[in-house]
A protein has these predicted regions:
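Serine-hydrolase catalytic machinery in alpha/beta-hydrolase-like enzymes
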Residues: 9, 14-98
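Catalytic histidine-centered segment of alpha/beta-hydrolase-like enzymes
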Residues: 74, 186-198
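Gly/Ala-rich beta-loop-alpha elbow adjacent to hydrolase catalytic centers
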Residues: 107-115
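Acidic catalytic loop of the alpha/beta-hydrolase fold
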Residues: 136-137, 158-163, 188-189
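Short beta-strand/loop motif that positions the catalytic acidic residue
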Residues: 147-149, 153-156, 160
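Catalytic histidine neighborhood in serine/cysteine hydrolases
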Residues: 173-189
Length: 209
């Protein structure tokens, strides 16, 4: 069972978060939740499951609420300011880790879109996991070159209408280094595939260095 404590990421705006920080941990992962306009927050089941999978591999974990969600200050910014929220969370976790203080990034659904955008924006990462990326939605933008020094995972359910196999295959052609995992029978919410998702994320987290 992951042991977390509530924290606040200071900044403009301040962000509500949950941190699990093993003593002396040099590696960590920031987790981005799904779309806040559709009820997504840091307690979304997939985000919690992802944090638990990473924590079992010894990584510090930081789940946070985007601006305007829960106790986070600010207001919805159409995905623009939310990218700054991701960067603030990455910087906050880095400050709390032991050297070399390397941080990976994982995002689910809308959170995967922002994680990919931040990785393509030059943020140096120890790994990237895109969970159920919404490839078939207008909000998805194919990322450019990614600044990643570790494993890249793309995982989706076979029954996910927002991440069809054709779009997933197209993404794999521009991310040849990615481990692409399709979970049979799982939908966008992984309601029938949380165990398989847990295994895929634990394997990814074990490769973060």
């Amino acid at each position: 069972m992951i042991v977390e404590r509530p924290v606040t990421i200071l900044g403009e705006p301040s962000l509500e978060a949950a941190l699990a920080l093993p003593p002396g941990a040099p590696l960590g992962v920031v987790l981005c939740h799904p779309h806040p306009r559709y009820g997504g927050d840091l307690d979304s089941p997939v985000v919690v499951a992802a944090a638990e999978a990473c924590a079992r591999q010894g990584l510090a974990t930081l789940r946070f609420n985007f601006r305007g969600v829960g106790a986070s200050a600010g207001a919805w910014d159409e995905g623009r300011g939310e990218r700054d929220d991701v960067r603030a969370a990455l910087a906050d976790l880095r400050r709390q880790l032991a050297p070399p203080a390397r941080v990976a990034l994982a995002g689910y659904s809308f959170g995967a879109s922002l994680a990919a955008a931040v990785a393509a924006g030059g943020e140096r990462l120890a790994g990237l996991a895109l969970i159920g990326p919404p490839l078939a939605t207008p909000g998805w933008q194919r990322p450019g070159p990614l600044a990643i020094d570790g494993p890249l995972l793309v995982v989706a359910g076979s029954e996910d209408p927002y991440c069809p196999r054709a779009a997933l295959a197209a993404l794999a052609t521009v991310m040849p280094e990615a481990i692409v995992t399709v979970i049979d029978g799982a939908d966008h919410f992984f309601s029938a595939g949380l165990e398989a998702l847990d295994a895929a994320l634990a394997d990814w987290a074990a490769k973060v260095w």
